[in-house]
UniProtKB/Swiss-Prot annotation:
PROSITE patterns: IG_LIKE. This chain was isolated from an IgA myeloma protein that binds galactan. This is Ig heavy chain V region X24. It comes from Mus musculus (Mouse). Keywords: Adaptive immunity, Immunity, Immunoglobulin.
Length: 118
């Protein structure tokens, strides 16, 4: 059974944060992986994707200067390093597997990141 489990969310102050996605039930090292998010009351926004060997990483242009996607195939884990997060980055963050037919075939449940200076 394919499972994707995100972690690292919660209430954070503006600045940096690290999200993780632990994968199981498939050969993680053979698949492209992706991050996406959905802010409250808004549609889903694709963040970026990474190829199996980490040699190709694509980002949504507006986010590429604040987010870094990486992976550790030995640990079956995908990462999203976020810098300069602000209140508008409050969202439910998901990881997803890109299937062989060019679409996302499995999604995690997501982890909620709430950015607040209070």
């Amino acid at each position: 059974e394919v499972k994707l489990l995100e972690s690292g969310g919660g209430l954070v102050q503006p600045g940096g944060s690290l999200l993780s996605c632990a994968a199981s039930g498939f050969d993680f090292s053979r698949y492209w992986m992706s991050w996406a998010r959905q802010a409250p009351g808004k549609g889903q926004e694709w963040i970026g994707e990474i190829n199996p060997g980490s040699s190709t990483i694509n980002y949504t242009p507006s986010l590429k200067d604040k987010f870094i996607i990486s992976r550790d195939n030995a640990k079956n884990t995908l990462y999203l390093q976020m810098s300069k997060v602000r209140s508008e980055d409050t969202a439910l963050y998901y990881c997803a597997r890109l299937g062989y037919y060019g679409y996302f075939d499995y999604w995690g449940q997501g982890t909620t990141l709430t950015v607040s200076s209070e």
